[in-house]
A protein has these predicted regions:
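A short, conserved structural fragment
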Residues: 48-58
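Mature soluble domains of exported/periplasmic/lumenal proteins and thiol-rich metal-chelating peptides
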Residues: 24-27, 57-61
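Residue-level signal for short amphipathic helical patches enriched in basic/charged
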Residues: 20, 35, 50
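Alpha-helix N-cap/helix-initiation sites
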Residues: 3-6, 22-23, 37, 55
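Short amphipathic alpha-helical interface segments
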Residues: 6-32
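Short alpha-helical segments that sit at the start of domains
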Residues: 1-14, 60-62, 67
Length: 67
């Protein structure tokens, strides 16, 4: 895993969120992007660091929204 790969995962997650009008759970992102859970979380971290997503804990999952 390197920075370039994580950036590609972040692009896939961002595109999925954008296509879904900005909101998904981690479970939904895994299903939509076909990424593994650790890859989805790495991508979310990348996007959060760039200020592009909000992350909210909802019961046993995490919801991610575009800003």
């Amino acid at each position: 895993m390197n920075v370039e790969t994580i950036g590609l995962w972040a692009g896939a997650v961002w595109n999925a969120l954008n296509d879904a009008n900005g909101s998904f759970t981690v479970k939904g992102l895994k299903k939509t992007t076909k990424l593994k859970e650790k890859e989805v979380f790495a991508a979310i971290g990348w996007l959060a660091r760039e200020g592009k997503v909000n992350v909210t804990e909802i019961e046993k999952d995490v919801e991610v929204n575009l800003i």
